[in-house]
């Protein structure tokens, strides 16, 4: 039996219900789609956090934009002269990472600390879309009026 991992597809959608949980698999995308590494955390029913590992970047080299239903994080290292590395294990290549946001999910803020960019998201469901309880009226038999009489 063949198993596919579709978790990379879920990482790019925030606030959507996972309709295909039973299919917990698909292709594993490699390369650019997985750089920089990130975590998507559910903090509560309506709060999420995206954390990106951006070692070697500074806050002024990173751009975070939210436009309609897409959150885009871009980074580009500034040129600081030529350096001669014997071994280079910390990547500094430019990147662009996008996340699809569900309806009513907004970006609350972002902070950068020790090479980790954290973006806070909150889902705000409008009152008109929230479930509400409908009261049921109970009419007693004495409140019912008879409209016609039975013929004799």
Swiss-Prot record:
Q: Does the keyword Repressor apply?
A: no
- Which InterPro entries does the UniProt entry name for this protein? A-crystallin/Hsp20_dom, ACD_IbpA/B, HSP20-like_chaperone
Instruction: Give the family, as the similarity comment puts it.
Output: Belongs to the small heat shock protein (HSP20) family.
Parts forming coiled coils: none
Q: What is this protein called?
A: Small heat shock protein HspA
Q: Which UniProt keywords apply?
A: Stress response
> Has UniProt tagged this entry with the keyword Transcription regulation?
no
Species this chain originates from:
Bradyrhizobium diazoefficiens (strain JCM 10833 / BCRC 13528 / IAM 13628 / NBRC 14792 / USDA 110)
Query: Mind telling me which SUPFAM superfamilies this protein's record contains?
Result: HSP20-like chaperones
Which PANTHER family does the UniProt record give?
PTHR47062, SMALL HEAT SHOCK PROTEIN IBPA (PTHR47062:SF1)
